[in-house]
Amino acid sequence: MYFPTSATVIEFLILAIVDKEDSYGYAISHTIKKVANIKESTLYPILKKLEKAGYLNTYQQEYQGRKRKYYTTTERGKQQLTFLKGEWQLYTNKIEEIVEGRLEDDEK
């Protein structure tokens, strides 16, 4: 995609992905890469930040003889996701208004 993706948008996407289903880093990264060009080296610090903020919890589960770290949303994470959904809607509505020439200029 042409448009750069901020860390806040990545946080929003992570919360949305994990809220639908507990997931692990590689799977989260694979899903986000469908809309944003990110590297795992970018993703993991954001996952850690969300965990430290209390938005995500982790647990380990064995998969093919190895332990895999899964992420799950907390109640606080669900609240943050709801907030970010609202902010995203406002943001995209304003962009759409500008693109379509419907945004009123307050300084006129």
What feature does the model see in each segment?
Residues G54:
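Glycine-centered, phosphate/nucleic-acid-interacting loop/turn motifs that mediate DNA/RNA or nucleotide
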Residues L47-K49:
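Short, hydrophobic-biased segments on the C-terminal half of alpha helices
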Residues T82-K108:
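Amphipathic alpha-helical dimerization/coiled-coil segments
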Residues Y2-T42:
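N-terminal helix-turn-helix DNA-binding core of bacterial DNA-binding proteins
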Residues Y63, K67-K85:
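Basic, amphipathic "hinge/linker" alpha-helix immediately C-terminal to the N-terminal HTH DNA-binding motif
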Residues T58:
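Short beta-strand "wing" residues that participate in macromolecule-binding interfaces
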